[in-house]
Regions:
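Acetyl-CoA-dependent GNAT
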Residues: 2-80, 84, 89-90, 102, ...
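Short glycine-rich hinge loops at helix-strand junctions in the catalytic core
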Residues: 96, 113, 137
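Active-site acidic-Proline motif in GNAT/NAT acetyltransferases
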Residues: 89-91, 95, 124-125
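Conserved GNAT acetyl-CoA-binding A-motif
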Residues: 109-121
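Conserved beta-strand-loop-alpha-helix junction that forms the acyl-donor binding cleft
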Residues: 119-129, 147-153
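Glycine-rich acyl-CoA binding loop
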Residues: 94-102
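Conserved active-site alpha-helix within GNAT-family acetyltransferase domains
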Residues: 99, 124-142
Length: 168
């Protein structure tokens, strides 16, 4: 059984580790050789503190009786809610846990008056996440973030959009 439960402080250390792993995974998508360091965990703790602010909801993902990840919802204003981050421990992936967690998050968001849509931010290299979100009906492009690297650029893949080449 998969269930979202509101974050509880007793899971702080494990949640900080998962947040650090989440960001480390995203770095690895760019082939960056980043390692988890003490500062990774300090930054993860700061992130956790931000996620506990009133305009956010943080849920732990439970599978059977174990916590296996987290899901973070942000309410930025207006009628759009954001599933800001979702993370499932590596050993529990491809078991439908993220799919069910997103569906449960959609129901949570629907329970708040005034929200008419849900958005995700996803890095283009995270193909697994893109396929999952698309499968769940997230097939409308909204805001596109364009970026200019001021220093070395490790982005070596190209995607065409409106006839223009964009690195990712």
């Amino acid at each position: 059984m998969i269930k979202l439960v509101p974050y509880a402080a007793e899971f702080k250390d494990d949640t900080i580790k998962r947040i650090a792993d989440f960001y480390h995974y995203h770095s690895s998508l760019l082939n960056e050789k980043a390692e988890l360091t003490e500062s990774s965990y300090v930054e993860a703790e700061e992130t956790l503190e931000n996620w506990l602010e009133p305009s956010h909801e943080l849920y732990l993902i439970k599978f059977k009786q174990s916590v296996v990840g987290f899901l973070h919802i942000g309410y930025r204003g207006g009628n759009v809610a954001w599933i800001e981050d979702i993370y499932v421990d590596k050993n529990y992936r491809n078991k439908g846990i993220a799919t069910q967690s997103i569906r449960d998050a959609e129901e949570i968001i629907k329970s708040h008056a005034g929200y008419t849509s849900i958005c995700f931010d996803v890095v283009p290299r995270n193909h697994e996440a893109l396929r999952l979100y698309h499968k769940l009906g997230y097939d409308n492009l909204s805001i596109i973030t364009v970026r200019k690297e001021l220093y070395e650029n490790n982005r070596d893949k190209i995607e065409k959009l409106m006839g223009l080449d964009f690195k990712y």
